[in-house]
Every structure is written in C-alpha cells, then in structure tokens.
Amino acid sequence: MAVFKTLTDADIATFSTGLVAGVDEVGRGPLVGDVVTAAVILDPNRPIAGLNDSKKLSEKRREALFDEICEKALSYHVGRASPLEIDELNILHATMLAMQRAVAGLARAPELVLVDGNRSPAFTHQGLTLISHSIVKGDGLIASISAASIIAKVTRDREMDALDAAYPQYGFAKHKGYPTKAHFDAIAEHGVFDQYRKSFKPVKALLER
C-alpha cells in the first residue's frame, strides 16, 4: 500500500483502467453510535457534478448528491462497526473493519481501492485480494472518495436524527453525537445508554463515578 499526499482522478487513470472504489469514513470522534464507512464505484459514463468532501457541502447539497450517487454509481455499499466493536477493538481498528465490510459488500469487484487518509486496511472481495492506496485529504481530490464521504455522512446523520427522535433529551440532531458542551450536559443529566462508546474517556469517566 502506498500513501499519496497529492493525487487526482487524472493521475489514477494513468495506472488503472479498471474499476476504482473510493472509501471514506465518518463518525470516529462521536461518543455514540456506529462508525460508518462507505465504498463507491462511480460510472465514468455517468459523471456527477459537484462532488467534494462532504464536510464542505451544505446539508441540502449532500442530500441531493446522495440521491444522485445512489442512482448513478455502478456499486456502493455502507459498512459499519458497532459501539461494542469499537470498545473491543479501539476506534482505529473498528474503522478499518468497517471499511473492509464496505468494500466486501460491493456488488462488483474493484481493481483498485482508494482510501481517504494516511492508512488503509487490507481489502478482499469474494476471496480476491485487492490493491489499495491511501490518499491524504482524498475526499477533496478523488471523485469516488468524495462520493463515499457523502454516502457515509448522510447515512450517519440520518441515523443520528433517528436516535434524536428516540432520545430527544440528548440533542443528537444538533451535535450528531460529538463531544460538545450541550452533549456533555445531557449526559450528566440523563446518563448513557447502550449506543454509547463506553471506552471513550468522557463516557468511561461518567460510568466510573
């Protein structure tokens, strides 16, 4: 596996003519819920305008692109690791596992897997070992990684909205489970439940009181 700091879709075309899957994650920092990843294989014959790092897009734009990606992609799949797996493995290894699940779930096998960040797990698809590279800030450079970041972000945000409906006293729709003051205040008042990551320091400290 190589790590690239600058790489574009045009560069990739010079060394891979097969299917390319982009992979990204969301939700490593929150105190609650799954870490969510996505793998996306885009169709070069059906380009999608406006793809970018999901964090740089408005919620409305992310939602619109989410629908377009789902419609036009050759294949996409969401992988995740649960709070229990995060507590057992640690957040890094759980994220790598979720990425592997996303790629393994693709309907088609990619020739190359490109991962946002500076590290990548080993990937297999139906017993075939895949070539993978990581690209620093790849979600703003590579269209398939941008698409994966959008799929993962929208998926997790919707899950936080659903959790907010079930537990409105925590304010998940606003902070999405991240460690904000409002979230800490809610935890102090209402405690934690089974979707919390009990190995994370703020949660662990509360449980040890």
UniProtKB/Swiss-Prot annotation:
Residues 18-209 form the RNase H type-2 domain. It is an enzyme of class 3 (hydrolase). Its main location: cytoplasm. One of its GO terms (cellular component) is ribonuclease H2 complex. Keywords: Cytoplasm, Endonuclease, Hydrolase, Manganese, Metal-binding, Nuclease. Manganese or magnesium. Binds 1 divalent metal ion per monomer in the absence of substrate. May bind a second metal ion after substrate binding. PROSITE patterns: RNASE_H_2 (PS51975). Coiled coil: none annotated. InterPro entries: RNase_HII, RNase_HII/HIII, RNase_HII/HIII_dom, RNaseH-like_sf, RNaseH_sf. PANTHER family: RIBONUCLEASE H2 SUBUNIT A, RIBONUCLEASE HII. HAMAP family: RNase_HII_B. Belongs to the RNase HII family. This is Ribonuclease HII. It comes from Shewanella sp. (strain ANA-3). The gene is rnhB.
